[in-house]
Design a protein with these regions (language model features):
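Electropositive, glycine-dotted interaction segments
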Residues: 89-225
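C-terminal lobe/lid and adjacent interdomain/linker elements of RecA-like ASCE P-loop ATPase modules
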Residues: 2, 297-385
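P-loop (Walker A) phosphate-binding loop of NTP-binding proteins
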Residues: 11, 30, 286
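Phosphate-binding glycine-rich loops of NTP-binding sites
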Residues: 23-62, 190-193, 267-276, 291, ...
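N-terminal pre-Walker A segment at the start of P-loop NTPase domains
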Residues: 1-15
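Conserved P-loop NTP-binding catalytic core
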Residues: 40-106
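Phosphate-binding P-loop
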Residues: 16-22, 273-275, 307
Length: 385
C-alpha cells in the first residue's frame, strides 16, 4: 500500500498542497523551501499512530501547533493533513484519512481536533466530532487513530502509518555510537542503531541482505571483497560490520565500520533500509558523501530494490547527478517554489516548457533545477567579509 495523494493546509511552509504521489517521488527545491517539512507530514502521522505516541506528543515534539502552522496563514488558521491510501498509483482509493487541528484559545492551549475523518472506499467509517465529543470536549485532544479501542474499524490505516520510516544517515553515529550518550531519537532517523537493527534480524535474512549489499559495494567501493556482521566477544558482545579488502597479503586486509568512509557507511545504511520492509521510506539527500558516478545510479538502484514489494520511496535532493537519470519522470518529480505567501508544490509535468525540453532529450536535472534556483544568485559573488 502507498500514499497515493496528499493534501496539506497551513502545514509548515505550505498554505496549500494538493498533489498525487507514486511509488517513487523526488522533492526538488532550494534551501529552506520545505522539502524536510513536506516529509515531516508523513512522520507526524506516524508519530500519532505509533505506540507511545499520540496527537499531544506529536505536536509537542514539534514545539506546539503555533510552530507547525504556516506563517502565511491568516483567516483560516486550522492545520490539516489529508492522505489517500491505495494499493498502487493506478488503483482506486482504498482508504482515506484526514485530520484538522486547532489550538485552545485559553488555559493550557492544547492542540485539539477540528475534525478527524476516515473513509474506506466511498464509505464513511469515522466522522468526528460526534455526539460524544460534543458532550465531552476533552475527547478531542486525542485521535481515534492512536487508540487501539477506537481504531478497530480502520486499524489497517494505523498500522500502515505507524510503519513509515525516515533515514538520513549520520556516519559519525554509526562509527562512534558510544560517544553520543543519552537516549536515541524514536525511529532511529540518523542510523545510530543500525548495527543493533542488523543484529536483531534473523540469521538467514541477515545473510541474504548483507550478500546483496556486498554485491553493490564491490561495484561501488574499490578493492572491497567481502562484507560481514560480527560480534566481538572480547568487547563484551559489541556488534560490528567487517569488510575484507583486496591486499598484497593472500587473506586481504580487514576493516571495521569505525574505519569505513562516510560514503560507504551511508551506502550501507541506505541499502539496508531499502531491503528492510515494505513500509514507505523517506530519504533525505541520499547523495551526500557519495561519488557522482554512484549518485547517478541511485534512482535505478532504488527502483530495482523496491519494485518487487512495491515499496514507496520519497526522496529529497539537491543533486543534478541524481536527477540526470533519464528514468526519473516529470510525474514523479515535485518542484517546491518558495514565495512570501508560502511554498507552492507542483509536479514537473505541469510545466509545459519542462515537458517540451524533456521530449527534446534533456533530463529532469537539466530542466528542473535551473527553474528553482534562487533569484539574484549572482549577487552571492559580491559578498565580502
Amino acid at each position: 500500500m502507498i500514499v497515493s495523494h496528499i493534501t496539506l493546509k497551513n502545514w509548515r511552509n505550505f498554505q496549500v498542497v494538493d498533489v498525487p504521489l507514486g511509488d517513487r517521488v523526488f522533492l526538488v527545491g532550494p534551501n529552506a523551501s520545505g522539502k524536510s517539512n513536506f516529509l515531516d507530514a508523513f512522520r507526524f502521522l506516524r508519530d500519532i499512530a505509533k505506540a507511545g505516541g499520540g496527537l499531544q506528543r506529536a505536536v509537542g515534539d514539534r514545539g506546539g501547533l503555533s510552530k507547525i502552522r504556516c506563517l502565511a496563514a491568516r483567516r483560516y488558521p486550522d492545520v490539516e493533513i489529508d492522505v489517500t491510501l491505495s494499493s498502487s498509483p493506478d488503483n482506486g482509493i482504498k482508504w482515506r484519512y484526514a485530520i484538522g487541528m486547532k489550538q485552545q484559545t485559553r488555559g493550557a492551549r492544547k492542540p485539539f481536533l477540528a475534525y478527524e475523518r476516515v473513509w474506506q472506499d466511498a464509505n464513511t467509517i469515522l466522522d468526528r466530532p460526534d455526539d460524544e465529543d460534543r458532550r465531552d470536549a476533552e475527547r478531542l485532544t486525542q485521535t481515534h487513530l492512536e487508540q487501539i479501542s477506537a481504531n478497530v474499524d480502520f486499524r489497517e490505516v494505523a498500522r500502515f502509518l505507524e510503519s513509515v520510516s525516515y533515514l538520513h544517515v549520520v556516519p559519525q553515529l554509526i562509527r562512534h555510537p558510544r560517544a553520543f550518550t543519552g537516549p536515541g531519537l524514536p525511529g532511529d532517523p540518523f542510523g545510530r542503531s543500525l548495527l543493533e537493527r542488523i543484529g536483531k534480524t534473523n540469521d538467514r535474512t541477515k545473510r541474504s541482505r548483507l550478500k546483496k549489499i556486498e554485491t553493490a559495494l564491490r561495484i561501488a567501493v574499490p578493492q572491497l571483497k567481502k562484507l560481514s556482521y560480527v560480534v566481538d566477544s572480547a568487547e563484551g558482545g559489541i556488534p560490528h560490520l567487517e569488510a575484507v579488502y583486496d591486499h598484497w597479503r593472500p587473506q586481504g586486509a580487514k576493516q571495521r565500520e569505525s574505519e569505513f568512509s562516510d560514503g560507504t557507511l551511508r551506502l550501507v545504511g541506505l541499502l539496508w533500509s531499502l531491503l528492510e520492509r515494505e513500509a514507505p521510506l523517506l530519504l533525505e539527500e541520499p547523495e551526500l558523501s557519495l561519488n557522482a558516478a554512484i549518485v547517478r545510479k541511485l534512482p535505478a538502484l532504488i527502483h530495482r530494490m523496491t519494485r518487487k514489494n512495491r515499496r514507496q520511496v520519497l526522496i529529497s535532493t539537491h543533486s543534478a547527478e541524481l536527477l540526470s537519470d533519464k528514468g526519473v519522470g516529470p510525474d514523479e518529480t515535485l518542484l517546491l517554489v518558495p514565495s512570501p505567501e508560502g511554498t507552492t508544490v507542483r509536479r514537473a509535468s505541469e510545466y509545459k516548457d519542462i515537458r517540451d525540453l524533456l521530449e527534446g532529450g534533456l533530463s529532469i536535472g537539466d530542466v528542473a533545477l535551473p527553474r528553482i534556483d534562487p533569484e539574484n544568485m549572482q549577487q552571492l559573488l559580491l559578498f565580502e567579509t
